[in-house]
Amino acid sequence: MIKVSVMYPSKPGMRVDHDYYRTKHLPLIKSRMGAPLKYYTIDKGLADGEGKPLGAYVAMCYLRCDSVDEYQSSFGPHAQEIREDISNFTDGTSIHQISEVVVENSAKVETAALQRSPID
């Protein structure tokens, strides 16, 4: 399993519409990627490690797929459309990281995440 992390660094005066990100942008990604996107999570930055607002990142999402190839083949054909939608929720830029998931606490964690917010 791989995890694609998309993180938006905090910047003074940065515009971020978290509602749009949650209700439009990520569902767009899910609808375009289809079954290869097993699930996703969205984080909203609140504070840094010392509790100071806003933290290093103002918004983050994590996409889970079985492999890099599955991610690239399902995301790639829609990359331009997805990138063009970014300006609808932020004027910031993102940092991307693809990682291999080495440990995931348990299936219970995944099940709980899926039950919190359906993505289909």
Describe the residue ranges of each PLM region.
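Macromolecular interaction modules
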Residues: 1-120
